[in-house]
């Protein structure tokens, strides 16, 4: 086993990486509220795992979506648990994200030289909210249908471009199969990919600049 480790150590310098991670200085003023970003990340990872598991059973069509969710909850092995964890962690992720943004703002973590960290964080917050909107529509139940109809209808009040924006969001003039397909694609592919990209920008900047000091 040691020979295998030595082989990787010689090429990747694993010990140096481990030492850098474990020896990072943590300011004395840091408390549990500075863990909110990490908790949000943990919730996101839970979302990815449970969401991936549900894609094996979920069918993104207006005629089968609701029935497939019922199947997950009543027939699939541990499906009820996986979907419940997905819902609970989704709510927790939104809550932790909001608290994290407030903590950073109230402690001045957005100030120089951390402006870019703040910008990427705000983008991640918007992406988190987008997860909620797109995911809410996927069960194709009454609550999800009317929520999507209202949310996608908001831009209609904008002069000139309002109606085209609504059609762009829905895929048609009304909420239907095109809307479900778009929201499913956004929820399972586009948003996770964008979130991963901005996380890969966000965390190295935190690592490089360190945690902001007390006010």
UniProtKB/Swiss-Prot annotation:
Heme c binds at residue 35. It comes from the Eukaryota. Heme b 2 binds at residues 86, 187. It is found in: Plastid, Chloroplast thylakoid membrane. It is a multi-pass membrane protein. It holds the Pfam family Cytochrome_B. One of its GO terms (biological process) is photosynthesis. GO terms for cellular component: chloroplast thylakoid membrane. PROSITE patterns: CYTB_NTER (PS51002). Binds 2 heme b groups non-covalently with two histidine residues as axial ligands. Binds one heme group covalently by a single cysteine link with no axial amino acid ligand. This heme was named heme ci. GO terms for molecular function: electron transporter, transferring electrons within cytochrome b6/f complex of photosystem II activity; metal ion binding; oxidoreductase activity. The keyword GTP-binding does not apply. The chain crosses the membrane at residues 32-52, 90-110, 116-136, 186-206. Its cofactor is heme b; heme c. Its main location: plastid. Heme b 1 binds at residues 100, 202. Belongs to the cytochrome b family. PetB subfamily. Component of the cytochrome b6-f complex, which mediates electron transfer between photosystem II (PSII) and photosystem I (PSI), cyclic electron flow around PSI, and state transitions. PANTHER family: CYTOCHROME B. The 4 large subunits of the cytochrome b6-f complex are cytochrome b6, subunit IV (17 kDa polypeptide, PetD), cytochrome f and the Rieske protein, while the 4 small subunits are PetG, PetL, PetM and PetN. The complex functions as a dimer. Heme 1 (or BH or b566) is high-potential and absorbs at about 566 nm, and heme 2 (or BL or b562) is low-potential and absorbs at about 562 nm. This is Cytochrome b6. The lineage of its organism: Eukaryota, Viridiplantae, Streptophyta, Embryophyta, Tracheophyta.
